[in-house]
């Protein structure tokens, strides 16, 4: 009959399932090769339904044709060697065949904390993994729709680097075909993870030029290199897009397996998400675009968009562009780039609670400068916010503990007659003015906030490789010596001793096992989450001990 205990156990079981997460401190990516390697011909994966002209160009396996690029546009000999670009926050490689970004490193985010000189690799087009950003010109006259294959661009240099004191870096790739000169321009800014990709079309032919710009992200089905989980709950790995009706719409790999998606949107964005990092194409806000997902002939997943028709009269010039973001999920930056893009920091269905929590945590960090201490202060503030609810819960538990001898007497009196025992217990609760749900409901009310905080600590890139003190050098991975999980288990045991013993023997056994079960689960939890739980437990113990002692003292005084 103990409804409160049943609900509490169920709630703990739900929390256990949601929060059981094992982290892997190996982010599994190698650095970019230091030497120029031959670029393999990559499939552009032109969006379905976009006119490919009358030449029947293949959308899956294009081939490069150097003869289509005139020598006068090539300051150096045409080459298929990758073009290297380095800024203060990006290291990338561009394939001259099509001008796709096929490799990209993030030097400000090391692959591992103990290897600070090996950057995390976001894009790769090697043998083990496929993840790249593609763009091009398709349509009736687009060079990416030619039967001879995608254009082979020429660059003035084989490598480019943002120099000290330089705020912007521009990389131009050039190509000419049938009297039309193309410049594919990559514009980088110091300290920024977004870059502008533009096409300058100079039509020197004797007729009008018509085409469309497309931009897309292509990825295989490999796992997330920045995260690994032990049970069914994981951070989202998949595509997402903006629509007029949904500012953040997920499109998982399973969704793409079931069939292609095609929507007409004005502006918007398309993105690929993984733990801590996001890649997004952001077209001009005024453009009417066709957003599409599909799977190519090699089994890779594609999300992208095709822009409106571009018309360039004979002798005319036109420029079209899109923004590419490839980097960490920094909410303030993402929000500046496009509406809804900050939602790619996926806090789950409780995002509306999680975002204010992160805002508060960020402001605390701006004062303290340490994410560990910030978590502690945030936990104290949240605990203070819910102090009245927690106090009501602990008072109910204290009263339950005070009547525990009477409950034991009822059990001995009625034995296995559960119906009579339940009736007698309800009469006792009524007499003692105890609400059997009084201790549980406040906990359930607080649970959404605690779960939202869990997702904040899990998903925020700011926690990645953030140190606290002493042996805790990374709050996003497990405690290397399991000290915090053991302390957490001890605090759970102490807190359990303050609670009344359940009258049902089975429930009592389950409750006794909870500290052991949670300690085992928390061995692999990120240290930041365990730190939150330890601080929360310590505050709960102090509050519960104080309330319990006061009620017990008042009970003894009344009895005397």
UniProtKB/Swiss-Prot annotation:
PANTHER family membership: CYTOCHROME C OXIDASE ASSEMBLY PROTEIN COX18, MITOCHONDRIAL, OXA1
Renumbered residue ranges of the record's region Disordered: 42-66
Record's protein name: Membrane protein insertase YidC
Transmembrane segments: 1-21, 341-361, 367-387, 437-457, 468-488, 515-535
Role: Required for the insertion and/or proper folding and/or complex formation of integral membrane proteins into the membrane. Involved in integration of membrane proteins that insert both dependently and independently of the Sec translocase complex, as well as at least some lipoproteins. Aids folding of multispanning membrane proteins.
Molecular function terms, GO-annotated: membrane insertase activity
A GO BP annotation: protein insertion into membrane
């Amino acid at each position: 009959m103990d409804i409160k205990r049943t609900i509490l156990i169920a709630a703990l079981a739900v929390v256990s399932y949601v929060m059981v997460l094992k982290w892997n401190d190996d982010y599994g990516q190698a650095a970019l090769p230091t030497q120029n390697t031959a670029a393999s011909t990559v499939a552009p994966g032109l969006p379905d339904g976009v006119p490919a002209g009358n030449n029947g160009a293949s959308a899956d396996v294009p081939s490069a044709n150097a003869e289509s690029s005139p020598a006068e546009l090539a300051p150096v000999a045409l080459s298929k060697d990758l073009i290297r670009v380095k800024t203060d926050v990006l290291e990338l490689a561009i394939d001259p065949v099509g001008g796709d970004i096929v490799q990209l490193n993030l030097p400000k985010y090391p692959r591992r904390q103990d290897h600070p000189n090996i950057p995390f690799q976001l894009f790769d087009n090697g043998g083990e993994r496929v993840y790249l950003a593609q763009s091009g010109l398709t349509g009736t006259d687009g060079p990416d729709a030619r039967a001879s294959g995608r254009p082979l661009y020429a660059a003035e240099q084989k490598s480019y680097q943002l120099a000290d004191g330089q705020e912007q870096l521009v990389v131009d790739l050039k190509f000419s075909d049938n009297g039309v000169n193309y410049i594919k321009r990559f514009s980088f800014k110091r300290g920024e993870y977004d870059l502008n990709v533009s096409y300058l079309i100079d039509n020197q032919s004797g007729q009008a030029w018509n085409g469309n710009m497309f931009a897309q992200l292509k990825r295989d089905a490999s796992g997330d290199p920045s995260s690994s989980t032990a049970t069914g709950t994981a951070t989202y790995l998949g595509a997402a897009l903006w629509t007029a009706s949904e500012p953040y719409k997920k499109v998982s790999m399973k969704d793409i397996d079931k069939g292609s998606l095609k929507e007409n949107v004005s502006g918007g964005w398309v993105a690929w998400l993984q733990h801590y990092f996001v890649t997004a194409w952001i077209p001009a806000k005024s453009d009417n675009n066709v957003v599409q997902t599909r799977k190519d002939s090699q089994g890779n997943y594609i999300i992208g968009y095709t822009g409106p028709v571009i018309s360039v009269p004979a002798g005319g010039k036109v420029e079209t562009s899109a923004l590419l973001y490839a980097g960490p999920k920094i909410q303030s930056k993402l929000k500046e780039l496009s509406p809804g893009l900050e939602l790619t920091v996926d806090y789950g269905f409780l995002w509306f609670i999680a975002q204010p929590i992160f805002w508060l945590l960020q402001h605390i960090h701006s004062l303290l400068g340490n994410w560990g201490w910030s978590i502690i202060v945030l936990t104290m503030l949240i605990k203070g916010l819910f102090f009245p609810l927690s106090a009501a819960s602990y008072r109910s538990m204290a009263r339950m503990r005070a009547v525990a001898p009477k409950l034991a007497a009822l059990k001995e009196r009625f034995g296995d007659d559960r119906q009579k025992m339940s009736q007698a217990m309800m009469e006792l609760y009524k007499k003692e003015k105890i609400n059997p749900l009084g201790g549980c409901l406040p906990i359930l009310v607080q649970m959404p906030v605690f779960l939202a905080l869990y997702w904040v600590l899990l998903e925020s890139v700011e926690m990645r490789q953030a140190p606290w003190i002493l042996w805790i050098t990374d709050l996003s991975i497990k405690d290397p010596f399991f000290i915090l999980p053991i302390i957490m288990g001890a605090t759970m045991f102490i807190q359990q001793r303050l609670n009344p013993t359940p009258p049902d023997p089975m429930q009592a056994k389950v409750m006794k096992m909870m500290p052991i079960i949670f300690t085992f689960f928390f061995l692999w939890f990120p240290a930041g989450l365990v730190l939150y739980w330890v601080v929360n437990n310590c505050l709960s113990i102090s509050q519960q001990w104080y309330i319990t002692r006061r009620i017990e003292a008042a009970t003894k005084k009344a009895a005397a």
